[in-house]
Amino acid sequence: KMTIEEFSAYAEIYWQKSIRPDLLNGIYQPTALKRAIIEKDDGSERLLAIPTVCDRLIMKAIAQVLSPLFEPEFSDYSFGFRPNRSQKMAVKHVQDCIATKRHTAVDVDLSKFFDRVDHDYLMTKLGRKIKDKGLLELIGKYLRAGIMDNAGQYFESRIGVPQGSPLSPLLSNIVLDEL
């Protein structure tokens, strides 16, 4: 377990020595994500999968690189997990539709969506735009990194995108955009 502050000192030593070369050579192996459980407003539980600080930073960098590639093609009517968009903007859009007599609106809450994303389908969609095979392989490794629960038991990840990953909102929108 490492804090962001502790990671700074760690990165000074290991970034040039091992992390960067491993990333560039395609041999970097993400760490299993840590299981966290949060209680939702309705009393049910949401399972999160929290990456290490190092993996979180790498995933955030991947998201920053991929976002300009995919964002321009997303529907103007999609507001969830999007940069420069908010729930208030979605509400305003619905109000504008009502005011202009366009009365059709859809509020979609897909049950356990993050847990059910098909990796092959997602990777195929990513492969249509991303030509860097090393980047595609790294994203695949993150999807399959697995989850470690609080008792130290490891669970494979064969399906789904982890809630708690900085890359998951973008990946989920890539899958959902066709809706």
Which stretches of residues belong to each language-model region?
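A short catalytic or substrate-binding loop motif that flags glycine-/basic-rich loops and adjacent residues
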Residues: 29-30, 40-42, 54
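Short, conserved beta-strand segments within well-ordered enzyme catalytic domains
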Residues: 1, 37-39, 47-51
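Conserved pre-motif C helix in the palm subdomain of viral-like polymerases
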Residues: 45-74, 158-179
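Short, Φ-rich (hydrophobic/aromatic) sequence segments
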Residues: 15-23, 58-66, 139
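Secondary-structure junction/capping motif
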Residues: 3, 49, 86-89
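Conserved polymerase palm-domain catalytic core
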Residues: 18, 22-26, 30-32, 36, ...
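Non-catalytic, polymerase-adjacent accessory regions of viral genome-replication enzymes
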Residues: 1-13
